Amino acid sequence: EQFKEKFGFEKAYGSYKELLDDPEVEAVYIALPNTLHYEWAVKAMKSGKHVLCEKPLAPCEKQVKELFETAKENHVYLMEAFAYQHSPYITAIKKEIEDGTIGEVCYIDSAFITSDYNKGNIRMRRETLGGCTYDLGVYSTSLTLGLLNEEPEKVEASAIFSEEKIDKLTSVVMEFADGKKAAFTCGMTLATNQDRRLDCLEIDGTKGSITGTKFAFNGDGELSYTIRTAEGQEEVKTVEVPQNYRLEVEQFGRCIDENEIPAVTEEFSLKNARLVERILEEIGY
């Protein structure tokens, strides 16, 4: 009731079940701890609700597949919430690659490292599937898969674990069938109590490279990326970026109202789940 009054909502619910039982509710956004995504996505879809669910949809490919089967059985939409995938910044970088600006992609490197969290945070607890791979690494896995449109043949990974048995720092190297390589590092190791984050990317091609920062940025503003050619020329391009969460919700709304294809498809979510599962197996999570 306090939340309703503060933000001016029409209704407040005493439980998730009460919300799902309301026939006026058409869609829900699930941002619960990782261990609860699967359970409540299933309950919501069986109640006839469209579901936008935070990443990761589930801890393994098998459960991700089951979620999409449940969506089809109940004639509802399910989309994994990767807000940054809706960003004009990512769209612009993808277009540079598609247009051949840097030639054939040879190598992708990315990093997403944030401040340390206190021990009570759900990201730091094994029982809620915490750890940097589930929380941050999925940005780099999805970025790599989205740019290369193929899955790696070989995955090597190593991690540093905390006392709570979650990965605090993970590094991954991937090799693809045609010789391409990709690597990333994710972590929650920057100084505690400082609102700091490092997220950056580099894409190297046969004719040049693209470098950028804040690829997972979710606020209003401008973002820039730099194109460097093999001849040594350099160009900085700036992109206006609105709030990615808004773009994500608007796109999901169009799926419901206009049967638009989800920006993050079932096929993509399954590919990403497979890759994350391989990484977690490699590091012994």
PLM feature spans:
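C-terminal helix-rich "cap/oligomerization" subdomain common to oxidoreductases
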Residues: K6, A27-Y29, A177, K237, ...
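Beta-loop-alpha module in the N-terminal Rossmann-like domain of NAD(P)-dependent dehydrogenases
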Residues: Q2-T70
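Rossmann-fold dehydrogenase core element
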Residues: K65-Y84, E104-Y107
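Predominantly a Rossmann-like dinucleotide-binding segment in NAD(P)-dependent oxidoreductases
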Residues: Y84-E163
